[in-house]
């Protein structure tokens, strides 16, 4: 970094660590984020400096570029700021302009600004937000854009000179290198030092407004031109600053409130589960499209009982069982039921039961056995078919409900435990909930609702070989 004392508004020659040289007007220095802002910047490329990636010069004039201080290799003051003429301190003057020539040559403070029609330094200094974004160098070396005056007119030359650096250029580079780098400014750089190039338009035709960056939202809105003769009142400025400084949470709340106003208002008669439209529609399924169900009168149980026909229900019940019985059954554990003679045994067993009932034999004789012959069907050495198992389950627990219901009907508890049989009559006792105890051999259907299903589902996986239940 070569000698000279830099001033705000002076022409600066800056060389980055990528060996690219830039020239522009010193706009401000942020020691908190260790950044340097230049206005009216032009890139001269790498020129003759040795580098791995030579870059040619560019003809465009950037309105505003922010450089990271740690990536600046050299900084030279080419020209000090030119003397600026000002109008006398007349309270009658609200705002003045000298035309385009003065704006380009920085002769008038009132029309001066690196962004063309941007407000003057005195207008910037009245905003506390700018003072927060672009802080001063330690001590009184750099003030924020200019001294604050009672009238928003021009600044005398002494005010601008007083707002310059009082340290040497080498000290300035040391402060920039020691400052922390700003992580949100890593994007949009063709060399490591370019932080933001907001405007790429040419200098003679600057836009009416320019965005300074993410940290300065006050400059992103349209700003008044120098031809305007009306001054903003302090109340209006306070209101605008209040809107700018509001946190993001308040803006999100305003957005949610606006959405909630657009939602149709639910009546008080609708269920409360319809709330939550702004939270992803939680509970919207609880709201009926045609409104809540309304009943004109109480339910008439007598008329409903009169319409109840038990014969029709029994007929439907038997039809459902018949349809299920007619379905072909899969072989269990590789055995073919057609060859086992189970059907003939079942038919013979039913015939024997009818003969016993017709003869009027005593159903319970404790001299012969402790068990009776009514509730026990284990007096015949046969295997129970799936059709009989379904029929017994239906008679005991009722018809099954929908297939996707986990508990309810006869598909309630017991789920899939049929393969856990052992000894006893568990699967063949009517209405036996647990199915444990007993003496005779059994396939081990543990009653319950899904005992038979469990054995059928796990028939292909040889579950009994690996997980045997101890006797």
UniProtKB/Swiss-Prot annotation:
Positions occupied by motif TFG box: 381-401
Segments carrying motif FFD box: 362-378
Sm domain residues: 1-81
Entry PTM: Phosphorylated.
Any GO MF annotation of the entry: DEAD/H-box RNA helicase binding
Cited PROSITE patterns: DFDF, FFD, SM, TFG
Cleavable signal peptide: none
One of the Pfam families matching this protein, by short name: FDF
Similarity field: Belongs to the LSM14 family.
Biased composition (Polar residues): 172-185
InterPro entries noted in UniProt: DFDF (IPR025762), FDF_dom (IPR019050), FFD_box (IPR025761), Lsm14-like_N (IPR025609), LSM_dom_sf (IPR010920), Sm (IPR047575), TFG_box (IPR025768)
Protein name: Protein LSM14 homolog A-B
Domain description: The RGG repeats are required for interaction with ddx6/Xp54 and accumulation in ribonucleoprotein complexes.
Subcellular location(s) per record: Cytoplasm; Cytoplasm, P-body; Cytoplasm, Stress granule
Subunit structure: Component of a ribonucleoprotein (RNP) complex, at least composed of lsm14a/rap55a, ybx2/frgy2, ddx6/Xp54 and eif4enif1/4E-T. Also forms a complex with prmt1 independently of ybx2/frgy2. Interacts with ddx6/Xp54 but does not appear to directly bind ybx2/frgy2. Different translationally-repressed mRNP complexes probably exist that contain either lsm14a/rap55a or lsm14b/rap55b depending on the developmental stage.
Location of the DFDF domain: 287-323
Biased composition (Gly residues): 411-421, 432-452
One of the protein's GO biological processes: P-body assembly
Keyword Repressor: yes
The encoding gene: lsm14a-b
Function according to Swiss-Prot or TrEMBL: RNA-binding component of messenger ribonucleoprotein complexes (mRNPs), storage particles that mask maternal mRNAs from the translational apparatus during oocyte maturation. Acts as a repressor of mRNA translation. Probably involved in the storage of translationally inactive mRNAs in the cytoplasm in order to prevent their degradation.
Cystines in this chain: none
Repressor recorded as keyword: yes
Compositional bias segments (type: Low complexity): 208-227
Protein source organism: Xenopus laevis (African clawed frog)
């Amino acid at each position: 970094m070569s000698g000279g004392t830099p001033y705000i508004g002076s022409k600066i020659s800056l060389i980055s660590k990528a060996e690219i040289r830039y020239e522009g007007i010193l706009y401000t220095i942020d020691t908190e984020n260790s950044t340097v802002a230049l206005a009216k910047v032009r890139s001269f490329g790498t020129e003759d400096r040795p580098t791995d990636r030579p870059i040619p010069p560019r003809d465009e004039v950037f309105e505003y570029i922010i450089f990271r201080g740690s990536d600046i290799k050299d900084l030279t003051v080419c020209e000090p700021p030119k003397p600026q003429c000002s109008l006398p301190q007349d309270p009658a003057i609200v705002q003045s302009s000298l035309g385009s020539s003065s704006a380009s040559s920085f002769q008038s403070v009132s029309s001066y600004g690196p962004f063309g029609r941007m407000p003057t330094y005195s207008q910037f200094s009245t905003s506390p937000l700018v003072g927060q974004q672009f802080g001063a160098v330690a001590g009184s070396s750099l003030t924020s854009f200019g001294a604050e005056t009672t009238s928003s007119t021009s600044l005398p030359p002494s005010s601008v000179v007083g707002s310059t650096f009082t340290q040497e250029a080498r000290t300035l580079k040391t402060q920039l290198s020691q400052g922390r780098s700003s992580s949100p400014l890593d994007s949009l750089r063709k060399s490591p030092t370019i932080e933001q190039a907001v405007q790429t338009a040419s200098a003679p035709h600057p836009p009416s407004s320019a965005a300074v960056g993410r940290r300065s939202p006050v400059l992103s809105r349209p700003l008044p031109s120098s031809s305007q003769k009306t001054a903003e009142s302090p109340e209006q400025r306070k209101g605008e600053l209040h809107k700018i400084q509001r946190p993001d949470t308040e803006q999100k709340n305003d957005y949610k409130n606006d959405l909630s106003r657009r939602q149709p208002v639910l009546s008080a008669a609708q269920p409360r589960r319809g709330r939550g439209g702004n939270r992803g529609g939680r509970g919207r399924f609880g709201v009926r499209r045609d409104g809540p169900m309304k009943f004109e009168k109480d339910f008439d149980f007598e008329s409903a009982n009169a319409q109840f026909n038990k014969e029709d229900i029994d007929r439907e019940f038997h039809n459902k069982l018949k349809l299920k019985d007619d379905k072909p059954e899969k072989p269990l554990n590789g055995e073919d039921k057609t060859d086992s003679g189970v059907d003939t045994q079942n038919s013979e067993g039913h015939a024997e039961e009818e003969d016993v009932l017709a003869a009027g034999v005593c159903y319970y004789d404790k001299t012969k056995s402790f068990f009776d012959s009514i509730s026990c069907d284990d007096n015949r050495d046969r295997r129970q078919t799936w059709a009989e198992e379904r029929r017994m389950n239906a008679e005991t627990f009722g018809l099954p409900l929908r297939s996707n219901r986990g508990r309810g009907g006869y598909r309630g508890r017991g789920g899939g435990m049929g393969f856990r049989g052992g000894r006893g009559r568990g699967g063949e006792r009517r209405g036996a909930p647990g199915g444990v105890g007993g003496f005779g051999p059994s396939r081990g259907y543990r009653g319950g609702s899904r005992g038979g299903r469990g054995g059928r589902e796990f028939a292909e996986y040889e579950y009994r070989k690996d997980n045997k239940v101890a006797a």
